[in-house]
Amino acid sequence: MVAQPSPIVGRLKLPESMPSLVSLEELTATKVLVTFLTIVIIAPRVFTVIKNAFSPISSIPGPLLNKLSPWPLTIATIKGTSHHFARSLHEKYGPIVVLAPGMVAVADTKEIKRIIQTEDWTKSEAIYGNFRQDPQRPTLLAYTDKKAYAKRKRMLSSMFGIKYIRSMEPIMMTCVEAAVRQLNKFCDEGTQGVAVVDMQHLIHSLAIDIIGITTFGGSLNVVDNGSHPLPSRLKAGLRIAGLMQLIPWIRFIPFLPTRDPYVDRFTYDIVDGRRQELESSQHSDLLQKLVEASDDSPGSDFRTSDVQDESVVMLTAGSETTANAELFTLMMLLKNPKVMKKLVDEVDQWYPPSEPDRQTDCGYSQAGMVYLQACIDETMRLVPGQATGSPRETSKDDVVLGYRIPAGTTVFPNTQEGHTQDAHWEEPQKFVPERWLEAQATNVPYWPFSAGSRVCIGKHFAFQEMHLTLVTLLRKFKFEYVDGQDESTVFRVAQQLKAESYRMKVSRR
């Protein structure tokens, strides 16, 4: 019998050049995948890089990578260091630099003034278009259309006039008094009347309560209770909003709601409840004005959802920026004891220690307490809330510092850099409030609240809150510096401390 070859042996002896059916299928699938990736993903990106390389702004100073890719700026934004990123570029390359394709930063004070004030360029759609709960219904902060913005601002402006803001002073003071009670409690529990207090938490809690009572008609009692779900949810939303300005694809993440369900329910219930009370009672707060102006009829420009969105912006942007300004002011004072003593002397002049029950009153002392205002101004010069400036957009081809800027380019008027230039300030990096008492101080480059038509509508509200808070705290308590803390800042919509807490020694005066 002749032995038959084993099927395995026979298979092994097949010519190596003869591909199997499986390998042909694998080869075809690989080619299809490579072709797909090349056409859909790689080729468009290569085209974009080539386009960026030949863009007019590629001639502007800055790293080559910034001109070709948005990733350096994106990474800085994710880390919260975009203001440091811009500063380092200006230090190396000069007053105009490329941040990313289609985005430049300008630190020249004459050009900053032209952009935000003289010519009043429109806000950048590339940035503020991603800062909206509803893309079709922006808030006052996120409008880029000038006519629509002007209409909304006219509607809201009466709420932020000095007269109406003064009428809210008594309810604002109830929140400040709660903070005083809390500090007294800490001092009672401290060693020999001295307590180490997380003043970052206390000041932010106070600012939230003040905005809460003026915007929602009732304090959120964060100072008394230590926390509240709404501020923590809004702070998380603020982080996402900061990222979405430069990373807009975040909003397309599956199952990510356009509104936080808790915030949406909370604000809707507040607004609906106030609407039902309109005929029976009146309130002296911002919510009253917002609800009175709203109308849910078809075609309305200001519906209940708009009231919700505007109130959320007021609560987040208003509390965050004001609290940070107050905290940074106290920090500057603690690191400059002579300035602190001079300010406390001014406080005692206007509110003598022999009259401890005298109520802090903006109408009485705000205009006269010039050194307090100088300390606040000097703090906001060095640490402005809008660290890189409010981004604007060229509506037509323009020339900035000799460089052509194509229409549609986002331009960051870097106000923080403009605030610290040797040409305008003696020892610009030093905290010297006295510089604001000089006659020429009114003509210096200074834009902590922006300028032009987009100047912050809440400016007077913020100053009143800062005055009430700082004067009351300095009347009642002595603050001392605690060494060894992280004082670096991050920028997420507003400039703030990187650390989650900042401690100070507190005792009664």
From Swiss-Prot:
It is found in: Membrane. Keywords: Heme, Iron, Membrane, Metal-binding, Monooxygenase, Oxidoreductase, Transmembrane, Transmembrane helix. One of its GO terms (molecular function) is iron ion binding. Pathway: Mycotoxin biosynthesis. This is Cytochrome P450 monooxygenase LUC2. InterPro entries: Cyt_P450 (IPR001128), Cyt_P450_CS (IPR017972), Cyt_P450_E_grp-I (IPR002401), Cyt_P450_sf (IPR036396), Cytochrome_P450_monoxygenase (IPR050121). Its EC number is 1.-.-.-. Cytochrome P450 monooxygenase; part of the gene cluster that mediates the biosynthesis of the mycotoxin lucilactaene and the lucilactaene-related compound NG-391 that act as cell cycle inhibitors with potent growth inhibitory activity against malarial parasites, moderate growth inhibitory activity against cancer cells, and no activity against bacteria and fungi. Its cofactor is heme. The keyword Heme applies. The lineage of its organism: Eukaryota, Fungi, Dikarya, Ascomycota, Pezizomycotina. Disruption phenotype: Abolishes the production of lucilactaene and NG-391, and leads to the accumulation of prelucilactaene A, prelucilactaene B, and two isomeric mixtures of prelucilactaene E, and prelucilactaene F. GO terms for cellular component: membrane. Belongs to the cytochrome P450 family. The chain crosses the membrane at residues 30-50. It comes from Fusarium sp. The gene is LUC2. It is a single-pass membrane protein. Heme binds at C456. Pfam families: p450.
